[in-house]
């Protein structure tokens, strides 16, 4: 119980700090999965916490001509991936973009993304008032086969098949 209360107080303090500095969202633990030669797509993952209700409505990156918000969902006992127009970011709640769930797809990669590199991302957020803002993020590139915690991934090949992803 004390851990929950402590975590809640930290979240409230962080949101108050955001509001005081005019920021509307923070991004934590942003990372991109490294690619293998000839692979033309990969995933980007992170935690986004908005100070007020917002939506993630777009992503841009100089590393990829095409960047989209995607969702993985179990449908008829098959994992399916599809692009989504937006992702709701409730006020004060961390929304995790992770392998096997919501994530950013970086597609048509002109060159491999190597572990240890950094990939710049620009997130486009929209408030309830229709106002848009961008957040610049530097995502670290992690080796193929890792998850957000740097542990070996059980689903490491999941994004490897996106190399032939077509739109």
Each language-model region and where it sits:
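N-terminal signal peptide c-region/cleavage motif recognized by signal peptidases
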Residues: 14-22
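Absolute protein N-terminus
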Residues: 1, 21-24
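Bacterial N-terminal signal peptides that target proteins for export
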Residues: 1-9
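Compositionally biased, intrinsically disordered low-complexity segments
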Residues: 7, 13-15, 138
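Compact, glycine-rich, soluble single-domain proteins
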Residues: 24-167
